[in-house]
Amino acid sequence: MAAVSGMRRTRTVSPTRWIVYAGSVFAGAWLATQLFYLVQIALWSFINPGSTAFMRTDAWWLSRDKPPAQVQHQWVPYDQISRNLKRALIASEDSTFATNNGYDVDAILQAWEKNKARGRIVAGGSTITQQLARNLFLSREKSYIRKGQELIITWMLETVLDKERIFEIYLNSVEWGRGVYGAEAAARYYYRIPASRLGAWQSARLAVMLPKPRWFDAHRGSAYQAQRAAVIARRMGAAELPQSQ
């Protein structure tokens, strides 16, 4: 009897309790990640981002080239970027950018149908703000989980920043080729001029590149690029630029 009473009982934890515990840890980590994103975006109201997730990934790979290379990137203020380029990007990437809330529901639904038909993710229906969310924080991976996070960050950007600031950060961080980021670096890389001097045709050709900048960098002067640039050039006059608030 004494031996029995001296034995310590082993407490078992029910599977339900483990599930609740694991769920709490996951939820806490998820909320902490969202808070990190939100704080970063709030800081960018008055501080320019030093780099993006895409830039850091490229910098890692470029450092392993032989000889090692570096990311080309130079921040320039919004008013030092050609209005031609601004109009070309809006005409090409997001015609309702100045007035939308960061989402294009019709484009998202069309992308969903296309992806379902192909059996894989081939389109995203992303607005300029969604592209910026991906460039700043996420990866090039195509998945519905990443898309969901992109939509949340898009809401944060649209809530905290005005449209002109969103566009300024986008213009300075979008990729235009392997290791080439932002309007200033692109203008100097492709045309050897500052972004402030980009003409309408040069801007239209740069806008064409954005869906596949590395492919177009390797296939400069393709017939498709010229044809698509002509279409964008015709639409540029109707492109509405955002106004600062």
UniProtKB/Swiss-Prot annotation:
Q: Which UniProt keywords apply?
A: Cell inner membrane, Cell membrane, Cell shape, Cell wall biogenesis/degradation, Glycosyltransferase, Membrane, Peptidoglycan synthesis, Transferase, Transmembrane, Transmembrane helix
Report the subcellular localization: Cell inner membrane
Q: Where are the transmembrane segments?
A: 20-42
For membrane topology, the record states: Single-pass membrane protein
UniProt EC number: 2.4.99.28
Q: Could you tell me which Gene3D superfamilies the record lists for this protein?
A: Biosynthetic peptidoglycan transglycosylase-like (1.10.3810.10)
The SS bond pairs are none
Indicate the segments annotated as coiled coil, or none if absent.
Answer: none
> What's an example of a GO molecular-function annotation for this chain?
pentosyltransferase activity
Protein name per the record: Biosynthetic peptidoglycan transglycosylase
Please name the HAMAP family in this protein's record: PGT_MtgA
Give the organism, scientific name: Burkholderia ambifaria (strain ATCC BAA-244 / DSM 16087 / CCUG 44356 / LMG 19182 / AMMD) (Burkholderia cepacia (strain AMMD))
GO cellular component terms given for this protein: peptidoglycan-based cell wall; plasma membrane
Predominant place of localization: membrane
Q: Which reaction does it catalyse?
A: [GlcNAc-(1->4)-Mur2Ac(oyl-L-Ala-gamma-D-Glu-L-Lys-D-Ala-D-Ala)](n)-di-trans,octa-cis-undecaprenyl diphosphate + beta-D-GlcNAc-(1->4)-Mur2Ac(oyl-L-Ala-gamma-D-Glu-L-Lys-D-Ala-D-Ala)-di-trans,octa-cis-undecaprenyl diphosphate = [GlcNAc-(1->4)-Mur2Ac(oyl-L-Ala-gamma-D-Glu-L-Lys-D-Ala-D-Ala)](n+1)-di-trans,octa-cis-undecaprenyl diphosphate + di-trans,octa-cis-undecaprenyl diphosphate + H(+)
Q: Which GO terms describe its biological process?
A: cell wall organization; peptidoglycan biosynthetic process; regulation of cell shape
The taxonomy runs: Bacteria, Pseudomonadati, Pseudomonadota, Betaproteobacteria, Burkholderiales
The annotated pathway is:
Cell wall biogenesis; peptidoglycan biosynthesis
- Function recorded in the entry: Peptidoglycan polymerase that catalyzes glycan chain elongation from lipid-linked precursors.
- Protein family (similarity comment): Belongs to the glycosyltransferase 51 family.
Protein encoded by which gene: mtgA
